[in-house]
Amino acid sequence: RGENEPAVYYHAEGDLLVLTLVDDLLIDGVESDIKWLLAELEERFDCKDPETVEEDSPLDYLGMEITRIGNTIYLSMEKYIENECNILDVQGRTPKVPISEPIDTTSTPLTPQQKKKFLAAVGMLGWLSGTVRCDISYAFSRIAQLSAMPTQSALDSVLRVFAYLRGCKELCISINQDAPDRNIQDIMTSQDTPNEWRFYSDSDHAGNREVQNKRRSQN
């Protein structure tokens, strides 16, 4: 198991990388090593036929669409976002720009049915922020803090996030396979990465007027 990612495993003597999520696997490596691993798994478990990421043929992995074009792999949640927006009925909603309204924890408490909708939406946001859409991580963390006693203001906020996502649902993460070769074992035990990442944030902690924000060292 990798030292820097507990859900990712590697074979110390082969070119093989396995990402796990409960009983779903993503496998990358040399074709012969992949076939060996699949044969080992099929001896112990009842496995579905494996799917392969082919050129211009997207593969769905738990709502995340994996597409390969040339030597670049794209990770997208576009279809997942569209589906969840339909479920939450936010097709006609547009986010305010800029969003200047703090979450009012003293507004009207949600009914049991509304709370069910709120918690489902928060769960969807959690999956999105933890996979491809890291741009909503701060918004998700703030909204999720209100899961115990959500209000109408909190529900409006989570729906605004989905309205934002619907407006830029095509954003994705790209991975270029032309990056310099590194031994898998070195990658999985390293505390740094040769990849260049850029992150941007417009979170305004100083301008947050919520009372509970003043009691936290970070959000």
What is each model feature region?
Residues N4, P50-V53, L171:
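A short, aromatic/hydrophobic, helix- or strand-capping loop or linear motif
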Residues E3, E13, T20-V22, E54, ...:
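Eukaryote-biased feature marking scaffold/signaling PDZ-domain proteins and nuclear chromatin regulators
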Residues L21-V22, Y61, R198-S201:
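Short hydrophobic beta-strand that contains or immediately precedes a catalytic carboxylate
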Residues R1-L21, N183-T189:
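Conserved beta-strand/loop block within the catalytic cores
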Residues L16, Y80-N219:
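Divalent metal-binding acidic/histidine catalytic loops
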Residues P6-Y10, E55-P58, I143-Q145, D178-R182:
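Short amphipathic alpha-helical segments embedded in low-complexity Lys/Glu-rich regions
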Residues D49-C85, D89-D104:
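Non-catalytic, low-complexity flexible loops and terminal extensions
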Residues H11-D46, E65-S76, Q145-Q152:
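Catalytic palm subdomain of template-directed nucleic-acid polymerases
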